[in-house]
Amino acid sequence: MSSDVVVAIDGPAGTGKSSVSKGLARALGARYLDTGGMYRMVTLAVLRAGIDPADAEAVGRAAQAVRMSVDYHPDGDRYFLGGEDVSTEIRGDKVTAAVSAVSSVPAVRTRLVGLQREMASGPGSIVVEGRDIGTVVLPDAPVKIFLTASAETRARRRNDQNVAAGLADDYEAVLADVRRRDHLDSTRRVSPLRAAPDAVVVDTSDMTEAQVIDHLRDLVRQRSEVAR
C-alpha cells in the first residue's frame, strides 16, 4: 500500500470475522492483530487457577498477573501464556464458554486495551479484529467495519465447523450458545458489543469469504485512498 492505514473490524462470533480479517490483512500487505485471542489467554489463565469466571475481583487480579505474548504469522498465529504455547487450548469449549464472562470484567478490559493499543501503534498498516476496536480500543481508526449475520447463520457456520472437526452435530445447542454470548456481549457494562457510529456495517449472511474480503478491500481504498 502507498501509505499506512489502521482498519478496525468488530462483530460477533460466527460472522467470518477472523478469516476475513486475516484475508484482508494479506490483501493489503498489513499486519494483523486478533484481540479475541488475548481475552482467551486470560480466560485460560483464570480457569487453570481454579477461579470462578463470575468472581470479578479474582479475575481482575489474575489478569494483572498474567504474562502473555503473540507471534503473528501468515500460516497461523501462536499464543503464549507464560512462555507456553496455548494456541490450541484457548480455542477449546471450556474457554469458549467462559470468555464472555471474563471479558466483561473491567480490570481485564483495562489491561488488555492498553496492550492492544501498544501493538496497533507499531509501524506499517494493520487490521485489528475484536469486539470493541472501533468504539474503545481505536476510536480514531480511519476505517471502521462492523460485520454482522443472523444468529441462525452464525450458529449454522459454527456447527458445520464442529462437525468438520469431528465434534457433535448439535445445531440447537450451538444456536442457544450464540444467543447467550450475544446477550452477554451486548449488555455488559464495560465496552458492550456495538457498531461505532461511523462504522460501515456489512451483513455477511449471504456472502462468501472471498466476496467479503473483496468488498472490505474496496471499502479500505475508498475510505483511506490507499491502493495496492
Curated annotation (Swiss-Prot):
Pfam families: Cytidylate_kin (PF02224). It catalyses: CMP + ATP = CDP + ADP; dCMP + ATP = dCDP + ADP. Gene3D superfamilies: P-loop containing nucleotide triphosphate hydrolases. It is found in: Cytoplasm. It is an enzyme of class 2 (transferase). Disulfide bonds: none annotated. One of its GO terms (molecular function) is dCMP kinase activity. ATP binds at G11, P12, A13, G14, T15, G16, K17, S18, S19. Keywords: ATP-binding, Cytoplasm, Kinase, Nucleotide-binding, Transferase. Its main location: cytoplasm. Coiled coil: none annotated. Its EC number is 2.7.4.25. It comes from the Bacteria. One of its GO terms (cellular component) is cytosol. InterPro entries: Cytidylate_kin, Cytidylate_kinase_dom, P-loop_NTPase. GO terms for biological process: nucleobase-containing small molecule interconversion; pyrimidine nucleotide metabolic process. Belongs to the cytidylate kinase family. Type 1 subfamily. PANTHER family: CYTIDYLATE KINASE, CYTIDYLATE KINASE/PANTOATE-BETA-ALANINE LIGASE. This is Cytidylate kinase. It comes from Mycolicibacterium paratuberculosis (strain ATCC BAA-968 / K-10). The gene is cmk.
